[in-house]
Amino acid sequence: MDIRRKIIKSNGFNVPSIIFTPSDIHGAAVIIHGYGGSKEEMLGLAYRVAEIGLKTCVIDLRGHGEHTLNLDEGILQDMEAAIKYCRSFGKVVGIGHSLGGRLALISSSDFAIGISPALNTSFGEETQRILKNVRGYRVREAFSGELWEVMKKLEKVNFDDNTKKSIIYGSRDVPEIISLCNSLKTKNSSVTEIENAMHSDIFTLERTFQSVISKLKDYLSDSKKYDKL
């Protein structure tokens, strides 16, 4: 496994990343963190994804980590820049946590997994307070609360084609996320609950890793069958 840092260059901005390259490549994956996170938080998940043969790119979103831009409504462009870079290695999977899960599910990736995705258009005062106190200090943004303005401007997730989207969430997740994910279960969406997982640790748990890998293997298997038609 080759692991190295790379700056992905795009139109007027650069996306810091860490790339995992397996010896035998069967496609690619882009992995993105949530609000107040960083690419370094997602390295454990990235390694497990790369082990099944996906060249895996973990990035810093604007306003986070080594990214030089402040958080703003162009945040999806960071993920799309990484997807574009990965296209030369085959079909691209998008995997993200929280805000990153929302971005993965609305991105141009061929298949997406949202881990505790922030699908809601609004969150309660208590959730906003916790995010501000626990995660906000890690983010470079023009003003406090910019996250909520960015969230309002992101497009909603289209679940019409459920075969290309999957969701994993925790039984002890953010209340708004639990409620919305439970409602999606009735619409035949691919939704998996991880028992006892919290919003803050779900992307580090072995049960989550196993669920992600299982979903990816199913997707890759179906994709190969489709390619042979």
Model-derived features: positions:
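N-terminal cap/lid segment of alpha/beta-hydrolase-fold proteins
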Residues: 1-22
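Active-site glycine-rich loops that stabilize anionic/oxyanionic intermediates
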Residues: 26, 34-37
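The conserved beta1-alpha1 loop
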Residues: 30-34, 169-170
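Alpha/beta-hydrolase active-site loop signature
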Residues: 36, 60-65, 119, 198-199
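Alpha/beta-hydrolase active-site loop
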Residues: 41, 70-87
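Conserved alpha/beta-hydrolase
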Residues: 46-66
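Gly/Ala-rich beta-loop-alpha elbow adjacent to hydrolase catalytic centers
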Residues: 95-104
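The alpha/beta-hydrolase serine catalytic core
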Residues: 109-229
